[in-house]
Structures are given as structure tokens and as C-alpha cells.
Regions:
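N-terminal short beta-loop-beta anion/metal-coordinating cradle
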Residues: 1-90
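Long, Lys/Arg- and hydrophobic-enriched amphipathic alpha-helices
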Residues: 24, 32-35, 187-222
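Conserved active-site and cofactor/substrate-binding residues in soluble primary-metabolism enzymes
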Residues: 28-32, 98-102, 106, 162, ...
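Hydrophobic/aromatic beta-strand patches that form the interior of the parallel beta-sheet core
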Residues: 47, 84-86, 118-120, 177-182
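A generic structural motif
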Residues: 90-94, 185-187
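Secondary-structure boundary elements
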Residues: 105-119, 172-177, 204-210
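Catalytic cores of processing enzymes, dominated by hydrolases/peptidases
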Residues: 126-205
Length: 222
């Protein structure tokens, strides 16, 4: 393997899909939020992305079967906009800038073929505050204002590291719209509380009620 490789498991019928990305990073906030979405909607896997830029190890599942590091794509049929959810257990090394651009471009290439024109990335930001917050970065002032009305705070305190920010910015260059939802975290451990906060905010934005019993204690710890 000398370049990213996309494997399709099935070909779902999607109408006006919205792309939602949640990857590991500060506090694993994005990945935790994505896993909660997948659980809530009982989302079905339909594609996997592999890359030689991912770490040189394999993961072992509960029955002892190994697989390469990968990004996983899931789909959710909905009345208004279908969801395409992507998550994974890794990102390219932060020192490998070219790899980040290549992988994020590959992701955007794929979701464009699915008909996605709006993207939502989720992640964590290392800000210590007494009150947990969801911050917003967007591709336009209009979108930033819309999500502020939903309760988010404009993020103007620095950079968004890794795929959480890069996917959003590269999508903007292709005339796609989108936002990044950022949960505050210390970043020293898997922050299930911050992940659940971002998940809950997104569910509210989608107009969905959270099932009873689905809380931060149901979020993955890794």
C-alpha cells in the first residue's frame, strides 16, 4: 500500500447526506461523540479508509482478529438529511503534515461522491474553564451565528489541530459549508463528559431527543 485506499462494504442510497466526522485527539472528544451518534442511531458501516500514513500496528478485536488502522464510515437514513458518520482510532502523526492533507483530501473526495455538501467535524480543545462549553468554528459568519443561537460559543482562541480543523478548511476551499463543534477538555485523558456534551449539542441541532439511559457513562473510554 503506497497511498490511501478506500474499501466499500455496501452502497447505501443517500439523500442530501450530512457528513459528521469524529476522530481521536484532545480528550478523544470527537471520537467519543461519534461513537455515541453511531449507538444512538444504530448506524450501519458501509466503507473503510486505509492509509500508509497511519501507525505501523494492527488492532485486535474481541474475538482475536487483527485489522489495520482505518477510518470507518457509517450511514443513517433520516427523513430530512441522511447522516454519514466517520470515526477511527488514529490520525496520521502530527509531524507528518503532508499525510494529514492527503488523508483529509481523500475523505472529502469520498463524501463528495456521496452527495455531501455540508460537514460537521467534532473534537476537543485544551481549555480549562469552570463551565463546560461547546465552541464553534464555521465556514461562514452566517453559520457561526446560527450555531451561536443554538448555544455554542465562537472559538477565537487559537488553532484547531489535526483533521478536525483541516477537513473543515479543505471542504471550504471546495465551496462546501460546515462547522466544527469543539468541547472543552484538559486533554490528558479520554474525556467522556466533553464527548457527551458535544454529542448532546449536535443532537439538539438535529432536532433529536436523546434516549433515556444514553449518557456519558455509555461513551467509550479509549
Amino acid at each position: 500500500m503506497d497511498k490511501p485506499y478506500l474499501r466499500k462494504l455496501s452502497t447505501p442510497t443517500l439523500e442530501n447526506p450530512v457528513f459528521v466526522q469524529g476522530l481521536p485527539g484532545f480528550g478523544n472528544v470527537g471520537r467519543i461523540a461519534a461513537h455515541l451518534l453511531i449507538k444512538f442511531f444504530d448506524a450501519k458501516p458501509f466503507a473503510e479508509l486505509y492509509s500508509p500514513s497511519f501507525p505501523d500496528y494492527v488492532s485486535i478485536n474481541a474475538v482475536g482478529v487483527c485489522h489495520l488502522p482505518r477510518y470507518e464510515f457509517y450511514y443513517v437514513p433520516m427523513e430530512k438529511n441522511n447522516l454519514v458518520i466517520m470515526t477511527g482510532e488514529i490520525q496520521p502523526s502530527f509531524e507528518d503534515v503532508v499525510a494529514h492533507y492527503q488523508v483529509c483530501d481523500e475523505v472529502i473526495d469520498f463524501v463528495e461522491t456521496l452527495g455531501c455538501h455540508f460537514i460537521i467535524t467534532m473534537g476537543g480543545i485544551p481549555i480549562t474553564e469552570e463551565k463546560a462549553q461547546v465552541y464553534i468554528a464555521a465556514t461562514s459568519p452566517r453559520l457561526a451565528a446560527e450555531f451561536m443561537e443554538k448555544g455554542a460559543v465562537i472559538y477565537s482562541k487559537g488553532r484547531i489541530v489535526g483533521g478536525t480543523g483541516l477537513t473543515l478548511a479543505l471542504a471550504k476551499e471546495r465551496k462546501m459549508e460546515g462547522v466544527s463543534l469543539l468541547g472543552t477538555t484538559t486533554g490528558f485523558r479520554a474525556d467522556r463528559e466533553a464527548g457527551f456534551l458535544v454529542f448532546k449539542f449536535l443532537m439538539k441541532a438535529l432536532g433529536k431527543e436523546i434516549k433515556e439511559g444514553l449518557g456519558e457513562n455509555n461513551a467509550p473510554e479509549e
